[in-house]
Regions:
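Short alpha-helical segments and helix-capping/turn motifs at coil-helix boundaries
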Residues: 18-21, 167-176, 420-424
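Short helix/loop capping segments that flank catalytic or ligand/cofactor-binding pockets
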Residues: 44-46, 122, 192-194, 307-308, ...
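Cysteine-centered catalytic environments shared across enzyme families
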Residues: 1-153, 158, 438
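ATP-dependent adenylate-handling ligase core
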Residues: 117-177, 187-214, 222, 227, ...
Length: 449
């Protein structure tokens, strides 16, 4: 068992780089070829592509960048949807999937949305589907039973690298297989076109130490559910592992980040995020979807990716370039709010600011006067309450099981503390501290024992 992997999984809820859960086994690096020589019996890897090959275009104007990115995105989507296979789309209330739906030529195509009935994704996806004329299907996630029904499949397909609190969508795959041959996924849209996480403290950090400490905090607390903190880590492991694991996640994070410090200053954090969050965590959504349908990824079109990352990072921060592209290509869909903040993704400043003001006023009225305006859940799957209700017995059976304690990894008394905190409802987000531990134990039972 790789001890660094334990430390990383507990602090980030995924692993970094090419690391696996087991020593002397690693993933093939992205952009690499593995070569096995039959004569000598030697094995080697060779990189065929690097981020260094992306040119820098600091002199291009913003308007030129919008025009070219719109052209490349249009071509990327149409390249992947013009054959004889039936395309379909998982549609959320975000920007990435609606942009694909708005640009694709074939009509109507099936769209699928999963989530709680009164969540933002379900509400806005329905509006987007109606505006775009898609054949829309909604799948409810009213309780945690779907997790129990699909947990073994999810573990098999993701090998434990993806905790069960990221299994949403897997319960829809049998239906998706009947509706589409090819899923045109919006995965990577925010990464390529401009993610919210692009911020000055990352793309223009004052020095490497400032970047490292802030980035570690983001990976630990912000990019997914908040995970175990430094103080909690001191109570988390049994001895003698406690002394060996304490601080190991941070040390390995620094080591993994070090090679990226040589890349262009405004994009090196994005490249690290791509390889260590997108590839190691969110790509698992694509992986388990591929168990039922082919998945095509328009946003990771080579030409589009290279062009977008040749631009100054400021062009892509806060969807600065994405919204003009949408306004140019799918203006009708910019009139439907973005689920993240419920503001319009339009470039019309007056319309956007007026609408945003109304949204804020309604929220304040609901909060301070009288709750009369509808508000929608931000989460499509209520994993927190699943764990308190339908999943509680299952989770406690794993966490408190003799086999779990006898591994001498996690401190049994602290596992009970975490679960008590979660059940008390006194804290907003404790599930990111518990779910990875359950998944890790399940992984050991399936692949190690």
């Amino acid at each position: 068992i790789d001890l660094t992997a334990i430390a990383q999984y507990v602090r980030f809820q995924h692993l970094l780089g090419v690391r696996t859960f087991f020593e002397d086994i690693q993933l093939l690096s992205p952009g690499s070829i593995l070569i096995y020589d039959l004569t000598s019996g030697s094995c080697d890897t060779r990189a065929y592509w690097s981020f260094n090959e992306i040119p820098y275009a600091p002199t291009i104007s913003f308007d030129e960048a919008v025009e070219e990115s719109a052209r490349l995105l249009d071509r990327a989507i149409k390249r992947r949807s013009k054959d004889d296979y039936a395309p379909g789309l998982f549609l959320s209330g975000g920007l990435d999937s609606r942009t694909i739906l708005g640009i694709i030529d074939r009509r109507p195509i099936p769209t699928l949305t999963y989530g709680l009935q009164n969540c933002r994704d379900v509400y806005y996806a329905k509006k987007i589907a109606k505006a775009a004329g898609s054949d829309h299907h909604w799948f409810d996630l009213p309780n945690g039973n779907w997790v129990l029904e699909n947990i073994d499949l999810h573990l098999d397909l993701t090998e434990g690298y993806h905790s069960w609190i990221h299994a949403h969508g897997i319960s829809t795959l049998s239906s998706a297989r009947q509706l589409m041959d090819v899923n045109l996924t919006g995965w990577g849209g925010g990464m390529v076109m401009g993610k919210r996480f692009i911020e000055p403290r990352l793309y223009s950090a004052v020095d490497d130490a400032a970047l490292t400490t802030h980035f570690f905090y983001k990976f630990n607390q912000k990019y997914t559910w908040p995970a175990i903190t430094e103080a909690e880590e001191r109570l988390h492991y049994q001895q003698p592992l406690n002394d060996r694991l304490r601080g190991l996640a941070y040390d390995s994070f620094r080591e993994e980040l070090e090679p990226y410090m040589d890349f262009r200053h405004d994009v090196k954090s994005e490249y690290f995020y791509l390889r260590n969050h997108e590839w190691r965590l969110t790509l698992n959504f694509v992986n388990f979807t591929r168990s039922h349908v082919e998945v095509r990824v328009p946003y990771y079109d080579y030409d589009l990716f290279d062009f977008m990352h040749s631009l100054p990072a400021e062009f892509r921060m806060q969807q600065r370039i994405f919204r003009p592209v949408m306004q140019k290509m799918i203006p009708k869909l910019t009139k439907i709010p973005y689920e993240y903040d419920e503001f319009l993704p339009t470039t019309n400043t007056y319309v956007r600011s007026t609408h945003a003001t109304m949204v804020k006023l309604k929220r304040r009225f609901n909060r301070h006067v009288w709750e009369i305006f509808p508000e929608y859940f931000t989460l499509y799957a209520d994993y927190q309450n699943y764990l308190r209700d339908e999943l509680r017995e299952w989770a406690e059976h794993i966490l408190y099981d003799r086999r779990t304690a006898e591994r001498e990894i996690f401190e049994p008394s602290f596992l009970k503390t975490l679960m008590k905190r979660h059940l008390s409802r006194m804290e907003d987000a404790t599930i990111g501290k518990i779910a990875p531990l359950i998944t890790y134990e399940m992984m050991l039972r399936r692949f190690y024992d």
